[in-house]
Amino acid sequence: MSDKRPRSPCSNNNDELNDSSVLTENMDTVATRSKNLPFHETYKSKPTPADKPYRVDGIDKYKELYEQSIRDPEGFWSQMARKELRWLRDFTKVRSSGTCLQDRLAWFLNGKLNVCDNCVDRWAEIQPNTTALIWEGDDPSSIRHISYIELFRNVCKMANVLKRFGIKKGDSVGIYMPMIPETIYTMLACARIGAVHMVVFAGFAAQNLLERLVNARCKIVVTADQGSRGKKIINLKDVVDKALEKIPEIKTCIVFRHLNGPIEFVKGRDFDGETLMRSEKPYCPLEDMDSEDPLFYLYTSGSTGTPKGVQHSTAGYLLYAAVTQKYLFNIHPGDIFGCAGDIGWITGHSYLVYAPLCNGITTLIFEGVPTYPNAGRYWEMVERHRITHFYAAPTAIRTLKRLGDDFVKKHDRSSLRVLGSVGEPINPSAWRWYHSVVGEERCSIVDTYWQTETGGIVIAPIPGCFDTKPGSATFPFFGIEPAILDPDTGKEIDGPGSGVLCIKNSWPGMFRGIFGAHYLHEIYTKPFPKYYFTGDGVLRDQDGYLWITGRIDDTINVSGHRLSSKEIEDALTNHFGIAEAAAVAIDHDVKGNALVCFVVLKDSGNRTFDLNNSSPHPFEYELRMCVRTQIGPVATPDHIIVVENIPKTRSGKVVRRLLRKIATGCNDYGDISTVANPECIKSIESSWAQYLKR
């Protein structure tokens, strides 16, 4: 299988991350977002039922536990690990001497455990009939309840299926599946036998799937015939077939018939998943896994442009996901956790699959979208399943807010105790609506900040501890020591101020590197050595509350999905008519960010490609389809503008901050002395104005 190595972070594609002037320029852009933040608007913490006491009762208890976790991380996390996880062999050392990615980072050394044992077996033993999974399909009438004992049997059968095809400890398994229980069976089956799963979001195109399957060195692919979202059918098997045409090394594809759509089986390669599972025994022995054995790879876009296979460990990841959920959402036995995130992203991995099951509660897996068959779908599910916790993206919250309160108020939401937001900073007006309308001013709002690389939430308010402020991520979780750094000097800023968000030291859930390209850890460490560089700006107010102000690298967040500017630009320049492209994000009321792409034509005199004078233009459709086909629908540009030139530094770097300012109507461009071709600015302004008049 060919090895498509991502480019070195020392190449020109990544020089911007190591250029403090670029970080400073980007900080200027995100700083404008903080001007109208409600620093002095607070909401009191909510009372909780007597049988659901707060895990941390008050700010004094939080300070005590937090200070312990920073002062004595070994003592704090060893106690948590022995309390929350079932070990097959106890660990002998809590963590290695390494405290960051440059070192050989390891937690719970010499310990043995199995993730599936912790998420399935131990609960099947003591509460076999408790519901583990509630699945609700795109069609509201399609509902399945799976108990812990049923989950155990199905996972064991799927594990035996994988073993039948020679999958063993350390092998990679590609998963390209809709939001159905079989997806979770497959993930847990991998964990049971020591295989490493690599889930790909089922909205990605064949090229994206191909790149990830190759990079992760997958031995087998598990998929379904089709998926359905908002009555829209996604032909998953067709995408897999197209990807596998170029990967002859993958000789097995397991296909689940979810919608019984028409599919063609490739003889000798494709096998029916249900038929295979029916023929297997409902028991499969556990594999003893070392604490540091990889559990999964999950690919995320970054500033290098090449998707990165983030690698997470077995013990540290599972512990951190479970503990953050238990404390930040005040989890208790009998709770029903409704995470609206997709399993193809880290939110689904951590807070739909691993944390709820490790905590022994019920988790919802929802195939559909929040607006189908109407905008009350989320709240209808809350009423139907008596969901106690709901965790959704600000994009969805903003969409539902815009569609009106009636869709919310017609459904009983009295079961809810905690409402969470995830994927991007939630704007204050959406926060207030979530609190007052959805939560009826009685639910705690947990605005969470974290990343694929962190494994779990790193900054968020713990219910019962603090007053909350709309739009603020509030305070760090246990073991997380945030640092606000000056982008020019790299020095820490104490007290109120804004800068680059970094994290000191390590924590159990921290990723262990980039699979197949461990040198890429420089992306996270080179800008500020000995710190974890998040790529986000942050502001700390007079009360110590933290406010995430947005990306300061060239990663774009659209509807909670992290996309790379470079990846989008490459897709556009793959079109025969495009010489250069630059992608930037501007604020969008619903999606958080809208994608604006500036393109330079290879034949600048060809009026056939004049997008700025007609609407819609066939060529514009072609370019959008280029991006959709190569990356996926989530990356579809909102605006495409033809320009004569793109502003660059003398070393050839695109000055995206200028393009952002033009697209947002800001005429204060600041210092442009580093721009090699400042004469192009007026021309771009004119092209943008012409485009807006279409």
UniProtKB/Swiss-Prot annotation:
One Gene Ontology molecular-function label: acetate-CoA ligase activity
Region feature Disordered, mapped onto this chain: 1-23
Gene Ontology BP annotations: acetyl-CoA biosynthetic process from acetate
Highest taxon, organism lineage: Eukaryota
Residues engaged in binding CoA: R229, G230, K231, K232, T347, S559, R628
Reaction(s) the record says it catalyses: acetate + ATP + CoA = acetyl-CoA + AMP + diphosphate
Known EC number: 6.2.1.1
Polar residues bias spans: 9-23
Alphabetical list of Pfam families matching this protein: ACAS_N, AMP-binding, AMP-binding_C
Top-level class of the enzyme under EC nomenclature: ligase
Keyword check for Iron: no
Annotated positions binding ATP: G423, E424, P425, D447, T448, Y449, W450, Q451, T452, D536, R551, R562
Keyword annotations: ATP-binding, Ligase, Nucleotide-binding
InterPro entries: Ac_CoA_lig (IPR011904), ACAS_N (IPR032387), AMP-bd_C (IPR025110), AMP-bd_C_sf (IPR045851), AMP-binding_CS (IPR020845), AMP-dep_synth/lig_dom (IPR000873), ANL_N_sf (IPR042099)
Family: Belongs to the ATP-dependent AMP-binding enzyme family.
Protein name in UniProt: Acetyl-coenzyme A synthetase
Organism from which the protein derives: Cryptosporidium parvum
Lineage start: Eukaryota, Sar, Alveolata, Apicomplexa, Conoidasida
